[in-house]
């Protein structure tokens, strides 16, 4: 029997299953990767917004990570919602011990509803503790603005932001997602590495049901990196995956519903292909 590749997510929860650890694990499964999850925050949220957040003590996060790493090593790691500086330091300790494992950061700062998920002190700490360790960071435009301090209102500003991530912050790669741009028809993303810039374009679907798209996108990249895919191929797969997940959204809930984490499997009949 061939052992599956393993991906670890470290993030908050979503009881409705649209975002956070729950969305990550479903995305890992759809990519044929065995998923593990460490919880940083218990988040009471739904398609209407975030009602309550209970951030776990960093020692509880450490205990979970210790359990994982004392038993098995993941082939790739992603972090999502990390609401305290102490928890960031705890995670950094494990990442520093396993620098060869690909690491993806989804810098979750705002929920789709606009609710803030990270205080200013923690935002500043993110730049010094975790971002320099990342193989790729996946900010949307508002998150890229928060991190770089720029007002990103043009392609020129996107290019400037990408250079800040690579040359000043020290991330190996960053993909700045254009889903929040004003282009009504095309969703354009920009992948920056030391080798240069590559762009990805997809049709933009007219729907409000996009809850958890950032989590899902970064989770698919993580799963593909766990399989040993090059970063460009991982991002290309994630773009196709998220596009189909939005196109075939299940329209759950009374607000911004989740995407369909299994649409890629069912539409393309790739149950076997995705596990390769």
From Swiss-Prot:
4-amino-5-hydroxymethyl-2-methylpyrimidine binds at residue 45. The keyword Cell cycle does not apply. Signal peptide: none annotated. The keyword ATP-binding applies. Its EC number is 2.7.1.49, 2.7.4.7. It catalyses: 4-amino-5-hydroxymethyl-2-methylpyrimidine + ATP = 4-amino-2-methyl-5-(phosphooxymethyl)pyrimidine + ADP + H(+); 4-amino-2-methyl-5-(phosphooxymethyl)pyrimidine + ATP = 4-amino-2-methyl-5-(diphosphooxymethyl)pyrimidine + ADP. This is Hydroxymethylpyrimidine/phosphomethylpyrimidine kinase. It comes from Staphylococcus aureus (strain MRSA252).
